[in-house]
Curated annotation (Swiss-Prot):
Keywords: Ribonucleoprotein, Ribosomal protein. GO terms for cellular component: cytoplasm; small ribosomal subunit. One of its GO terms (molecular function) is structural constituent of ribosome. This is Small ribosomal subunit protein bS16. PANTHER family: 30S RIBOSOMAL PROTEIN S16, SMALL RIBOSOMAL SUBUNIT PROTEIN BS16M. InterPro entries: Ribosomal_bS16 (IPR000307), Ribosomal_bS16_dom_sf (IPR023803). It comes from Nitratidesulfovibrio vulgaris (strain ATCC 29579 / DSM 644 / CCUG 34227 / NCIMB 8303 / VKM B-1760 / Hildenborough) (Desulfovibrio vulgaris). The lineage of its organism: Bacteria, Pseudomonadati, Thermodesulfobacteriota, Desulfovibrionia, Desulfovibrionales.
Amino acid sequence: MAVKLRLTRMGNKKRAFYRIVAVNSETRRDGRPLEYIGFYNPMVDPAEVKIDAEKVQKWLALGAEPTDTVRNLIKKQQA
């Protein structure tokens, strides 16, 4: 089972925000996640990002692969 760290879309039409989740790579975009890691709200200025660093490190140690967007959000959070 390959695990990915990726975004799932939440919110209303034209008012999206995203949860950052660990999910099986074969699961659909808004499918049931293995674990919630944080959230990303691009609708506010500046964009709001909250990521649980301990959970990210746990999943990366287990071999999870973040998507490009999630990788960039993690880097921003750490800086």
